[in-house]
Amino acid sequence: MLAALNLGGGTEKVMPKEIDVSRMDVDYTSTLASEIIKAKLKAHGGHITVYTARGLPCEIYAESDGTTFTSDKLPVKPAYDYKVFDDIVELLIKQGGRAKKGNGRNYKLGEPGCEENTVVGTIALHRGRTIGESVFDPVFVMAAILEWAGIAENGRGELI
């Protein structure tokens, strides 16, 4: 019964998914966050492990289309495109290098805590959400990727 519930403590290893990075076109001379992250992800074979501000691991995978990525912590479709990082960096620049992460779990887009000038609000707008809509909050993963790439610091409650 424990085996059926996956509670038996078995030693089976989960094989990582096979990733084809050959279709990932990267501009290695670009200063855009999207291109920097794509280049680093491609250099790592299309799979990395990043860590949240709390130290929890997140698996990141390049998708075969060469323009999007997924994570074991982001169960949403369609996959996120790399350009979301350009929007986040643009927000950081507009706000003098600091931006509140915001909260998409408890608030709808545009409500206090989930405003357009927060990281979660910026991501929601990038995904085509409109004011008043519920949003998925992927900031913990996006912030971890930005920190891994050396683009921003994943601070408590804010990106720096």
What are the language-model segments listed below?
Residues G97-C114:
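An alpha-helical, amphipathic repeat domain used for nucleic-acid recognition
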Residues M1-V14:
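N-terminal amphipathic/basic-hydrophobic helices that include classical n-h-c signal peptides
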Residues S30-K101:
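Long, low-complexity, charged/polar intrinsically disordered regions in eukaryotic proteins
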Residues C114-F136:
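Short helix-coil junctions and helix-kink-helix linkers
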Residues G132-W148:
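Short amphipathic alpha-helical interaction segments
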Residues E147-E158:
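A short, conserved structural fragment
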Residues F69-S71, R105-L109, A124, P138-V139:
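Long Lys/Arg-rich low-complexity intrinsically disordered regions in nucleic-acid-associated proteins
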